[in-house]
């Protein structure tokens, strides 16, 4: 490109870049490309032609205006008419246009050529600068310099891991040119605390406008990442090393106090304060605040911050409530001790203590504590009040309690538990509301966990399954909540006849159950699996875990079907003294709830199962009579009432296959397949007609799931010529069961069992019972007593 008088004009007329981005180097390239002489314009106007010479070219050639932002307004004003007249000129400046004279000159030059903006170096450019192809070295320099050309070059001139003298000198020179406001901002930015505008203004004593202007100056001066507001890491390192430790601690403490005063997010700053081992009162408050902020999203980190706060001088009592909440989410709080709370924290402390009690499985105590926890606590207390039969109190507190929509929905759902068909949709709505916002509290129990037993009671295990799966996927309630929901899911599937999940979850989670509610779940799962496998040895093991749970005498309505498993285990191992008090407590709770039909049927079914387990025909008749007088609206309850009548007939030896078949279908259709198979098996054993017995045994096998085996790793290989069925019979004989019990478990008639036992004895060559048991030990590879 040429001017009217033949002079060459560069294609680029304006170069924009921060200090150290290579503006001067780029100017030199453009001058060299023009092939002529260049005249540099000095701060005093040297190099400028006389006004009378306009529009002639200056005698020296191309006018070069470097660092135009530093030129006095008068010099810039003299350059404007030259540019307007077409004088060949190229200008380099910082990104910020500092005055009207520079703006006018910039506009004139931009009209005659292109504007080039110098961008940070990329990885390819840094690799070229380093002269090596080591990707980690390139990445390190690129990260430390943010692609700033001069900083990257200075780093490249030093050995890896050492300070660059060139960079230190550059930063010191740049710092000396800054005004006091920009220097103060630079030193606080070097702390790497990502301070908000108001906090930065507070610590530097500047207004928001002054602080923002200082950041702009620092960006133009090459101190701050051109694409952000953070200081270039390598520059920050130099500034930090340039300050005495005492000065750094003072700066950090000033930031800590400002963050607390502003109510800002202190977590990022807390990391830096800890890194410099700040132990001032303000730092201690920052650590405590960080623990509070993180207790729900990252309870493990929250506990670490609370420890830091105590180490820095915070009274441990001030961390107790937060520590308890974080511990609840992690499942590390085992006992319900008094949680200290002072002043405004007193109600909060009571709510947390009430939640601790709920997680310990003590709903009554939880309700009492939560009722003292202010308006929010009273709303949180409603499910526990309903669970323990304090229904009128629950209604009153639900009406008076104040809190978010999710908790009001949860209270409404809890009040509706007498009618599962109405309650479950409300629990779902509460769960959805809870998922849309942050509650800011650990729940005594989640909507999903409360909905599960109610849905199962209503014959809707699939909804319970779905809700619990959703809670697990979302991590609701932290690690402890996931653990709890997984155990509940295993129990739901156990009740629905899906034993595989119950076996695997119990194996994975049973040993780590810490809270009282989870120990109850584990005991119920253990007892339920042993009951369904017919394994008396494992039932005794399960009872050993269940007995301490029952001894607590803490009963609530949501536990009713869980307690069925434990009480049946007590009956089976002849521990009747544990049964009466629990049944009485359950009856009291159901009565205080107004004996809602669904729960009344469930309680009556529990009585029936205990009578069947105890082989008490008279008690079976009494329980059946009680159930048949009820008129439940739900299909599951109607199926249970009909089955109760058939149990009474079957145990009396009156087997009517035509009457029994629809009852079995009803139980299976309402997700009680194991109960149906058990009734069919007992009817088959008592049937006098071989054809009827055969039909019922086939039906029992259809209804039965695969045999429950608690130790999935244990396998028995056929030995001594025993068939697969004979090995099954041998295992049950070794566990001490009678022929009748074996027949009930395997859906075989006692005669068939007797035939199998005789064949096994013959194959093993045993002539006495002692020899027979010894031979079984050899074949099965375990002691019968272990069973």
Predicted regions and their residues:
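Short capping/hinge segments at domain boundaries that bridge a core fold to an adjacent linker or tail
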Residues: 24, 76, 166-167, 192-198, ...
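Sensor-1/coupling segment of RecA-like P-loop NTPase cores
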Residues: 70-117
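Winged-helix-like regulatory helical subdomains adjacent to P-loop NTPase cores
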Residues: 162-195, 203-206
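Amphipathic alpha-helical segments of tetratricopeptide repeats
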Residues: 220, 310-311, 337, 341-344, ...
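Helix-turn-helix DNA-binding segment
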Residues: 698, 711-787
């Amino acid at each position: 490109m040429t001017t009217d008088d033949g002079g060459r004009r560069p294609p680029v007329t304006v170069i924009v870049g921060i200090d150290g981005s290579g503006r001067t180097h780029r100017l030199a390239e453009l001058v060299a490309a023009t092939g002529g002489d260049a005249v540099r314009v000095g701060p005093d106007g040297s190099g400028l032609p006389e006004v009378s010479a306009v529009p002639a070219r200056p005698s020296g050639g191309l006018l070069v205006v470097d660092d135009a932002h530093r030129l006095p307004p008068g010099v810039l004003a003299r350059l404007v008419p030259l540019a307007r007249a077409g004088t060949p000129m190229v200008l380099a400046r910082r990104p910020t246009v500092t005055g009207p004279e520079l703006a006018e000159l910039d506009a004139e030059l931009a009209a005659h050529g292109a504007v080039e903006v110098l961008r940070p170096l990329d990885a390819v450019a840094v690799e070229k600068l380093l002269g090596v192809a080591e990707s980690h070295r390139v990445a390190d320099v690129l990260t430390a310099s943010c692609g700033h050309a001069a900083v990257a070059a200075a780093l490249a001139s030093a050995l890896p891991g050492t300070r660059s003298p060139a960079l230190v000198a550059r930063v010191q020179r740049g710092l000396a040119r800054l005004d006091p406001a920009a220097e103060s901002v630079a030193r606080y930015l070097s702390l790497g605390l990502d301070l908000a505008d108001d906090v930065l203004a507070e610590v530097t004593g500047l207004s928001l406008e002054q602080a923002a202007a200082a950041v702009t100056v620092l960006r133009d001066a090459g101190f701050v990442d051109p694409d952000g507001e953070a200081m270039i890491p390598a520059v920050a390192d130099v500034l930090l090393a340039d300050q005495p430790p005492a000065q750094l601690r003072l700066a950090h403490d000033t930031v800590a106090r400002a963050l607390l005063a502003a109510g800002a997010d202190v977590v990022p700053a807390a990391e830096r304060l800890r890194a410099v081992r700040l132990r001032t009162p303000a730092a201690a408050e920052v650590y405590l605040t960080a623990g509070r902020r993180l207790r729900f999203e990252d309870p493990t980190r929250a506990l670490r911050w609370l420890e830091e706060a105590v180490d820095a001088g915070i009274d441990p009592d001030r961390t107790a409530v937060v520590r308890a909440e974080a511990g609840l989410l992690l499942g590390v709080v085992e006992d319900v001790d008094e949680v200290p709370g002072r002043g405004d924290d007193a109600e909060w402390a009571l709510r947390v203590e009430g939640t601790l009690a709920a997680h310990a499985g003590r709903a009554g105590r939880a309700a009492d504590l939560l009722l003292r926890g202010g308006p929010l606590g009273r709303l949180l207390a409603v499910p526990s009040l309903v669970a323990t039969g304090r229904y009128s109190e629950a209604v009153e507190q639900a009406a008076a309690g104040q809190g978010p929509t999710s908790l009001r929905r949860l209270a409404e759902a809890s009040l509706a538990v007498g009618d599962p068909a109405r309650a479950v949709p409300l629990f779902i709505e509460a769960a959805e509301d809870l998922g849309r916002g942050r509650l800011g509290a650990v729940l005594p129990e989640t909507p999903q966990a409360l909905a599960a037993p109610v849905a199962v009671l209503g014959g809707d295990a699939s909804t319970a399954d779905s809700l619990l799966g959703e809670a697990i996927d979302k991590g609701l309630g932290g690690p402890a909540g996931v653990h709890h929901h997984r155990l509940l899911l295993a129990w739901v599937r156990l009740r629905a006849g899906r034993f595989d999940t119950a076996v695997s979850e119990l194996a994975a989670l049973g040993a780590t159950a810490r809270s009282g509610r989870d120990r109850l779940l584990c005991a119920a799962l253990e007892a339920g699996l042993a009951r369904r496998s017919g394994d008396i040895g494992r039932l005794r093991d399960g009872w050993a875990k269940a007995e301490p749970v029952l001894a607590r005498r803490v009963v609530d309505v949501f536990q009713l079907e869980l307690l069925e498993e434990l009480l049946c285990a007590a009956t089976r191992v002849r521990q009747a003294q544990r049964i009466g008090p629990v049944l009485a407590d359950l009856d009291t709770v159901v009565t205080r709830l107004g004996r809602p039909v669904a729960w009344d049927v469930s309680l009556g079914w529990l009585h029936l199962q205990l009578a069947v387990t105890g082989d008490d025909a008279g008690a079976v008749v009494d329980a059946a009579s009680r159930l048949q007088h009820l008129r439940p609206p739900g299909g599951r309850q109607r199926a249970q009432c009909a089955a109760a009548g058939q149990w009474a007939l079957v145990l009396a030896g009156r087997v009517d296959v035509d009457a029994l078949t629809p009852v079995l279908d009803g139980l299976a259709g309402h997700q009680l397949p194991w109960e149906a198979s058990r009734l069919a098996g007992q009817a088959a054993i008592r049937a006098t007609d071989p054809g009827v017995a055969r039909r019922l045994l086939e039906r029992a096998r259809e209804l039965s799931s695969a045999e429950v085996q608690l130790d999935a790793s244990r396998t028995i290989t056929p030995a001594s010529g025993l068939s697969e069925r004979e090995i099954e019979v041998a295992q049950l004989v070794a566990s001490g069961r009678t022929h009748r019990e074996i027949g009930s478990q395997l859906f075989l008639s006692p005669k068939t069992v007797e035939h199998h036992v005789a064949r096994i004895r013959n194959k093993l060559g045993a002539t006495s019972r002692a020899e027979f048991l010894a031979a079984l030990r050899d074949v099965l590879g375990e002691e019968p007593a272990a069973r």
